[in-house]
């Protein structure tokens, strides 16, 4: 992450990235400490944090966007202290370093800068040295602007379509500097081109044809960007329910929702309309059918209503207090115990009845259940074997009877 610092100022540009990071050139890294020792009393000795530059190799960063600050008031001839610091820092850190006469990348003074000397901008002595360097650079800059002022005034006037020439003297430096800022701002994209219809409720006002983009911006108001407009939209909106409906909405919508939509709807050029309506809490029914439902008969409607009432009652019972829940659990436990006792009594009586049917354990009142079941199984098997024997004997007797009947019939026929 590149190192950056911001001076303590109330200007809004210092809240962002007005001060760019600084980097060493490869051929000048070796002479850094040597140059610092030669300066002696002019600058402070190297801080412990300066070893960071030897450990990390920072990559160059792309140029930052030009500042969109507005022009200063006409009454102020000299810029404020914060504006002076901003002017010097922009000249030190921007792309103008390679093109201006203040410092040259090949010059040794660029490496000896107090800003590069203290990479973290820490310490009160570094701040004092920085203020001293800034004041010297600003004085040199203003002197060069004052020298260039009369020369600019002696030149022929620009065509009527161009901006008027700035005045000479101390105001010339500020005027030319702000003129450069206006030219840099003119190269930027106007937010009104990207957002022809702003997100706020106000109607877009047409700008004059010859207006300068830098002059259109207020002194105290920062430029309108997409991030600012998004934040304003988030702060202004208080949406309870957002519904996206067609422009030709059905006539079955209620009057309350229509009034709410008329009050809160914003103009939009698409066939879809964004509406905000306040829905009553008691009308929230997620299981309800859509608006295009078929009307049910009266009897079926009554059944549905009664079913809903029963569901609500059951839900209310479920959502009762903890005391009622405890009482219900106790009742259920008591009922379960009673039913379990009855079941055990019935089972015991059935075992007693089974014991009485088995001859071997009929008189044994203390016979366990396992013995009763085992003897009962044996007794059932013996009864089944006896049954099979009796069935076979019965079949033999039936055949003997048939044989005897046949013999009797033959005797009767022989006598006749």
UniProtKB/Swiss-Prot annotation:
The keyword Signal does not apply. GO terms for molecular function: DNA binding; DNA-binding transcription factor activity; protein dimerization activity. PROSITE patterns: BHLH. It comes from the Viruses. It is found in: Host nucleus. Efficient DNA binding requires dimerization with another bHLH protein. Keywords: DNA-binding, Host nucleus, Oncogene. This is Viral myc transforming protein.
């Amino acid at each position: 992450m590149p190192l950056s610092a911001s001076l303590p100022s109330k200007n809004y540009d210092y809240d962002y990235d007005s001060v760019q990071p600084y980097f060493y050139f490869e051929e000048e890294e070796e002479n850094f400490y040597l140059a610092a020792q030669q300066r002696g009393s002019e600058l402070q000795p190297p801080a412990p944090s300066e070893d960071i530059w030897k450990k990390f190799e920072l990559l160059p960063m792309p140029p930052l966007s030009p500042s969109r600050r507005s022009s200063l008031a006409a009454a102020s001839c000299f810029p404020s202290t914060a504006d002076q610091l901003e002017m010097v820092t922009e000249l030190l850190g921007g792309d103008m370093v390679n093109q201006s006469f203040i410092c040259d990348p090949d010059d040794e003074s660029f490496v000896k800068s107090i800003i590069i000397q203290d990479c973290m901008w820490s310490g009160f002595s570094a701040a004092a040295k920085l203020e001293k360097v800034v004041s010297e650079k600003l004085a040199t800059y203003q002197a060069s602007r004052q020298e260039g002022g009369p020369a600019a005034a002696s030149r022929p006037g620009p065509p009527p379509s161009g901006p008027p020439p700035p005045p000479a003297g101390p105001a010339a430096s500020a005027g030319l500097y702000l003129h450069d800022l206006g030219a840099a701002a003119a190269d930027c994209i106007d937010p009104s081109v990207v957002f022809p219809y702003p997100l706020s409720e106000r109607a877009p006002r047409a700008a004059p044809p010859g207006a300068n983009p830098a002059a259109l911006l207020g002194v105290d108001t920062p430029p309108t960007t997409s991030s600012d407009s998004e934040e304003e939209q988030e702060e202004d909106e208080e949406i309870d329910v957002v519904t996206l409906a067609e422009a030709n909405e059905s006539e079955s919508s209620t009057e309350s929702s229509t009034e709410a939509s008329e009050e809160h709807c914003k103009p939009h050029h698409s066939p879809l309309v964004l509406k905000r309506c306040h829905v009553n809490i008691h009308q929230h029914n997620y299981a309800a059918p859509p608006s295009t439902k078929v009307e049910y008969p009266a009897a079926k409607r009554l059944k549905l209503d009664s079913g809903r009432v029963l569901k609500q009652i059951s839900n209310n019972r479920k959502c009762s207090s903890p005391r009622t829940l405890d009482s219900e659990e106790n009742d259920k436990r008591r009922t379960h115990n009673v039913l379990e006792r009855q079941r055990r009594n019935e089972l015991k009586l059935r075992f007693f009845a089974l014991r009485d049917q088995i001859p071997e354990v009929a008189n044994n009142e203390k016979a366990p259940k396992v013995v009763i079941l085992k003897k009962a199984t044996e007794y059932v098997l013996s009864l089944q074997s006896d049954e099979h024997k009796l069935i076979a004997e019965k079949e033999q007797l039936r055949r003997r009877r048939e044989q005897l009947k046949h013999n009797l019939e033959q005797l009767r026929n022989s006598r006749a």
